[in-house]
């Protein structure tokens, strides 16, 4: 969008005000920190609206029949995904976030709740602010009895993603937004109950995931006390039955995984579905339930488990004392059979995924991971597969993505139920879409309603 010079300068100053790194001296809580930045963001939106007739791109037939790939058509505040640079969160790279965001009371990895704060406000919170936020999440994690009864009613063969989506939707009995909207609330105030619902869901979703993971212990999980002095990921691990000091590395992996997967721009299925349903003023519980159903699709959220299955099959075929040629031959066998190599390529990225590198850096500091033959296959594949895929010639990005490592790392730490990896992804992905739902309401964004066209219309 080409803004006039004066307007562009003004918008730039506003953006700097909104996105600057700041440590507030009064140590406001998250809602207060958000409230402080809303006026500037609204002013920026008002400036941008004046340029409503400006052209920001063109729509090609390939965009329409190709899943709208590459088409800039929605507002998303928390992150920007560049094809070459990868993901940035309010301008910060993953390495920036790992360096700047507060860590847990134990462990060395950035906290996903600190990432949520950054996504929502554009500011890096202090350690004390994050500790207070972690405490709030622990205190708001309780589930009503009807949710426990609902979880007990599920048939044993119901897919875990179906379960977590149903429970998330059913939690809208707790929605402050739905209740206040029914009574009547000023549109300018929509963001406050939306914020409250988003925090409530963020607090509850680890326990919901644990209900799905431990279906024979519904009452135990439903009433398990969380440690208010610990962080969101630590308490999630406790709910999964993997607490304690002996699982410290798993806790750090979970922190890193949840932070890395929290937001990846708005065009992916889970984020877009949440935004779409939320644009109809559905509450955050209903909206994110829709996002979870999108995440359940094999083209979106099932990649980590597919990578693990493929790697384990590869190990069974070539053993643990493999050569580079063994790996190369298995890759070619996969491609020649008409299958894809799981964990490689990306819908937007054209360079190596920095999230994959973050997980590999994590592994590089753990001798037990490096010694694991399954992980060694992951590492060797990352060295050989790009060349094979380039020679094959049918991919725009031959590099590994985050899924190439995440499932295998979970497997190493004893989390060996691949069907539940997407559920964990669903806990993480709540971060970004819930942030955007809050901003959708704070900015008064309208219902989403694109225009469709049929094939004959395109042919003309």
From Swiss-Prot:
It is found in: Mitochondrion matrix. CoA binds at residues 69, 187, 299, 341, 343-344, 395-396, 401. Optimum pH is 8.5-9.5. It catalyses: propanoyl-CoA + oxaloacetate + H2O = (2S,3S)-2-methylcitrate + CoA + H(+); oxaloacetate + acetyl-CoA + H2O = citrate + CoA + H(+). Keywords: Mitochondrion, Transferase, Transit peptide. Its EC number is 2.3.3.5, 2.3.3.16. Partially inhibited by ATP. Induction: Expression is highly induced by propionate. Also induced by ethanol. Transcription is subject to CreA-mediated carbon repression. Pathway: Organic acid metabolism; propanoate degradation. CDD domains: ScCit3_like (cd06106). PROSITE patterns: CITRATE_SYNTHASE. One of its GO terms (molecular function) is 2-methylcitrate synthase activity. It comes from the Eukaryota. Disruption phenotype: Blocks propionyl-CoA utilization, as well as growth on propionate. Impairs production of several polyketides such as sterigmatocystin. Its main location: mitochondrion. It is an enzyme of class 2 (transferase). The active site is at 300, 346, 403. Optimum temperature is 45-52 degrees Celsius. Oxaloacetate binds at residues 264, 346, 355, 429, 449. Signal peptide: none annotated. Belongs to the citrate synthase family. NCBIfam families: PRK09569.1. This is 2-methylcitrate synthase, mitochondrial. It comes from Emericella nidulans (strain FGSC A4 / ATCC 38163 / CBS 112.46 / NRRL 194 / M139). The gene is mcsA.
């Amino acid at each position: 969008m080409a803004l006039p010079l004066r307007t562009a300068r003004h918008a730039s100053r506003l953006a700097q005000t909104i996105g600057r790194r700041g440590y507030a001296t009064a140590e406001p809580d998250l809602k207060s920190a958000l409230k402080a930045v809303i006026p500037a963001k609204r002013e920026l939106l008002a400036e941008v609206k004046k340029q409503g007739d400006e052209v920001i791109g063109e729509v090609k037939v390939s965009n329409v029949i190709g899943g709208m790939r590459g088409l800039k058509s929605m507002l998303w505040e928390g992150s920007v995904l560049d094809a070459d640079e990868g993901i940035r969160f309010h301008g910060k790279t993953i390495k920036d976030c790992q360096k700047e965001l507060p860590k847990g009371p134990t462990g060395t990895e950035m906290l996903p709740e600190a990432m949520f704060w950054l996504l929502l406000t554009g500011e890096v919170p202090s350690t004390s602010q994050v500790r207070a936020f972690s405490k709030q999440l622990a205190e708001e994690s309780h589930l009503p009895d009807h949710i426990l009864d609902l979880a007990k009613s599920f048939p044993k063969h119901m897919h875990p993603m179906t379960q977590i989506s149903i429970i998330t939707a059913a939690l809208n009995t707790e929605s402050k937004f739905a209740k206040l909207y029914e009574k009547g609330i000023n549109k300018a105030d929509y963001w406050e109950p939306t914020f409250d619902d988003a925090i409530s869901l963020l607090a509850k979703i680890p326990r919901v995931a644990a209900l799905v993971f431990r279906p024979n212990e519904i009452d135990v999980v439903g009433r398990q006390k969380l440690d208010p002095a610990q962080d969101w990921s630590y308490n999630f691990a406790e709910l999964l039955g993997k607490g304690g000091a002996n699982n410290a590395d798993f806790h750090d992996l979970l922190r890193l995984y949840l932070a890395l997967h929290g937001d990846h721009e708005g065009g992916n299925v889970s984020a877009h579905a949440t935004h779409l349903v939320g644009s109809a003023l559905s509450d955050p519980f209903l909206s994110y339930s829709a996002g979870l159903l999108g995440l359940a699709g094999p083209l979106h959220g099932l990649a980590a488990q597919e990578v693990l299955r493929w790697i384990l099959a590869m190990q069974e075929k070539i053993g643990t004392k493999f050569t580079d040629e063994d790996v190369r031959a298995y890759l070619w066998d996969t491609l020649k059979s008409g299958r894809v190599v799981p964990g490689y390529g990306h819908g937007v990225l054209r360079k190596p995924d920095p999230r994959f590198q973050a997980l590999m850096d994590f592994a590089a500091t753990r001798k037990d991971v490096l010694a694991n033959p399954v992980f060694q296959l992951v590492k060797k594949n990352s060295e050989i597969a790009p060349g094979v895929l380039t020679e094959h010639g049918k991919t725009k990005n031959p590099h590994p993505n985050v899924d190439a490592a995440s499932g295998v790392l979970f497997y190493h730490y004893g989390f060996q139920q691949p069907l539940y990896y997407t559920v964990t992804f669903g806990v993480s992905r709540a971060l970004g879409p819930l942030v955007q739902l809050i901003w959708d309401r704070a900015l008064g964004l309208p219902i989403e309603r694109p225009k469709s066209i049929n094939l004959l219309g395109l042919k003309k």
